Regions:
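Peripheral, non-AAA+ core regions of ATP-driven protein-machinery
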Residues: 1-217, 221-225
Length: 228
């Protein structure tokens, strides 16, 4: 296998866009190049991923590695694509089986030492992954409680890249999986939660206008469509 696709997602305003992370490893001038309408923090993932893979006991070959985040029309922001990029590259190099990633959404930031850090926007991403037919979601251990608020999809929390790869290769002891379902505390959070502007990603100008309007009792009409 020299090519692999891993599913991920990006929060775009009030919606979630599923993203395909494609990795190709081939002969050629050694390089690690990423494309797909990327922000600066996503472009920096190439250095984080390469270092994390090396510090997790695996080696990148002296080959041409191309990573594409599709669709190219969607702007990719944040560090949540680190983990799907790493797994796509590792699967393309046969470090992990591609079959283990079928129907699995992946999100998470990766540190230089290979630890998997928490990210924002987990709840809507897991909900959309379930709606799109994903059977499981790999996410940072820090975000496990948030991910488990969504029923009907298996949550696989991970705290470092090395253990995650061992799990994907069949060592189920490497990832601690709690029983599915909501605890009473989780149910209280989910059922008693009220609408809050902090739940909305972006739309800062619209939120600010609404706050001013409420303070002055002004009626406003706003186009909430996110400009491309």
């Amino acid at each position: 296998m020299s090519f692999c696709t891993v599913l991920s997602a990006a929060v775009q305003g009030l919606s979630v866009e599923m993203i395909r992370v494609e990795a190709d490893v081939s002969n050629g001038l050694p390089m690690f190049h990423m494309v797909g309408y990327l922000s600066s923090e996503v472009k920096e993932a190439s250095e984080r991923v390469r270092t994390a893979i090396r510090n997790s006991g695996m080696k990148l070959p002296a080959k041409k590695i191309i990573v594409n985040l599709a669709p190219a029309t969607v702007r990719k922001r944040g560090a949540s694509f680190d983990l799907p990029i790493a797994l796509a590259v590792l699967a393309a190099m046969n470090y992990v089986p591609e079959e283990a990633l079928k129907g699995v959404a992946v999100i998470g930031e990766v540190s230089l030492e290979g630890k998997i850090r928490g990210v924002s926007g987990v709840l809507p991403i897991v909900m959309e992954a379930k709606n799109q037919g994903c059977t499981a979601c790999i996410l940072p251990e820090e975000n496990e409680i948030e991910g488990r608020l969504v029923s009907g999809i298996k949550i696989l929390p991970a705290d470092n890249l090395e253990k995650l790869c061992a799990y994907l290769n069949g060592d189920e002891k490497e990832i601690h999986r709690k029983k599915q379902g909501r605890s009473s505390a989780q149910r209280n959070i989910f059922e008693n939660k009220k609408e809050d502007f902090s739940d909305i990603c972006g739309q800062n100008a619209v939120k600010r206008a609404a706050e001013i309007a409420v303070a002055d009792c002004i009626i406003v009409a706003a186009d909430t469509q996110v400009p491309m």
